[in-house]
Regions:
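Active-site segment flanking the S-adenosylmethionine/decSAM binding pocket
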Residues: 84-89, 105
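Conserved beta-strand signature within the Rossmann-like core of class I S-adenosyl-L-methionine
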Residues: 97-109
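Short, charged/polar micro-motifs that form catalytic or ligand-binding hotspots
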Residues: 79-83, 116
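Helix-to-beta-strand junctions that scaffold the AdoMet/dcAdoMet cofactor pocket
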Residues: 83-84, 97
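A short beta-strand submotif of the Rossmann-like class I SAM-dependent methyltransferase core
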Residues: 73-79
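Conserved N-terminal segment of class I S-adenosyl-L-methionine
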Residues: 1-73, 87-90, 95, 114-200
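A short, structure-level motif marking secondary-structure boundaries and short turns
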Residues: 75, 109-111
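Flexible loop residues that form catalytic
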Residues: 46, 79, 105
């Protein structure tokens, strides 16, 4: 999906200097493998978390999970819409990591997806759950489809009181994983100039 390419692109920028990452509600998604420069990678899920030689899986309920540490970066992708107690869940993300990136389905109609308990979700609802405004947000829509479930909102939260510059993050972003399908053109690289122009610090 185009959405996952966008996630990979943003993590390469926003987590370029991260040494630890936790993916909350990982399911069995393998995208965490692409963040090769992050030494400590944990994938947490209430059942069957993703795991590999490079990624430690943690089977736990996030609301009762005790991290025992602060991660540099937390991901929570397409999870909150499934969680009845979305507000305490979202707020806890900021207690386990310095930087947080969240994605949610954007304005999907109720009943479109079984298991979603909060649709439709938009930036106002996400702001209510997290109690804060994102430092960067973007709505990513899948191309070549008119499905009502084609769009997702991605929001990034930088630590309060620390300098935040999209320009610097764009300059310092990590290269794509060397062994990740070298014959596949990275379409998002072509959008980098547009992205930077549209989001100048």
């Amino acid at each position: 999906m185009f959405y996952y390419e966008y996630v990979r692109y943003l993590v390469r920028a926003f987590a370029a200097d991260a040494e630890s990452l936790i993916d909350v509600g990982s399911g069995n998604a393998e995208y965490i493998e692409d963040f090769y420069w992050i030494h400590t990678r944990h994938a947490l899920d209430r059942k069957r978390p993703y795991s590999s030689a490079a990624v430690a899986g943690i089977e736990a309920e996030f609301l009762t999970f005790e991290a025992g540490r602060t991660y540099d970066f937390a991901l929570c992708l397409q999870v909150l819409e499934h969680v009845k107690r979305a507000k305490p869940f979202a707020e806890k993300l900021f207690s386990v990591a310095d930087r947080v990136m969240i994605s949610v389905p954007y304005q999907w109609p109720p009943g479109l997806e079984k298991g979603h308990v909060h649709d439709p979700v938009d930036l106002d609802k996400l702001r209510h759950w997290t109690g804060r405004d994102p430092d960067y947000s973007v709505v990513v829509s899948e191309p070549l489809t008119d499905s009502p479930g084609r769009s997702r909102l991605i929001a990034y939260y930088h630590p309060a009181g620390s300098e935040f510059s999209l320009r610097d993050m764009g300059r310092n972003m990590r290269p794509e994983r060397p062994d990740r399908n070298p014959n596949l053109p990275n379409l998002l690289s072509r959008l980098a100039v547009v992205w930077r122009r549209g989001n100048r610090a």
